[in-house]
Amino acid sequence: MRPIHIANLDKPRPVVVLTRDLVRSSMTNVTVAPITSTIRGLYSEVRVGQENNLEGPGVISCDNIQTIPRTALGRQIGWLFAKQETALGVAINHAFDLEITSVEAVLQAQQKQGS
């Protein structure tokens, strides 16, 4: 499950940390997706709310993914659930206009490149 932290961006705001746990402590910078209360209904958004330990409803804005200094990452306040993490992958796919239809397709493409 992906952690939700408070980060010092334009103002202190919740973010989902996208950098994987395994390397986060050794990285100078981490990649995050900000959470906002402005809900536009875009495919590049993932709904979150009180079930994620947030104050109210909002969305993860995958159109605004950014890399920040790890030191700008504050305390952890919540987590994404498994179904939200799946939705996050789809939203990132939309935000970057990637032609990925499934994890299996990616793995098959990687195997073909390696042969």
Regions found by a protein language model. Give the residues of each.
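C-terminal terminal-subdomain/extension
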Residues: 52-115
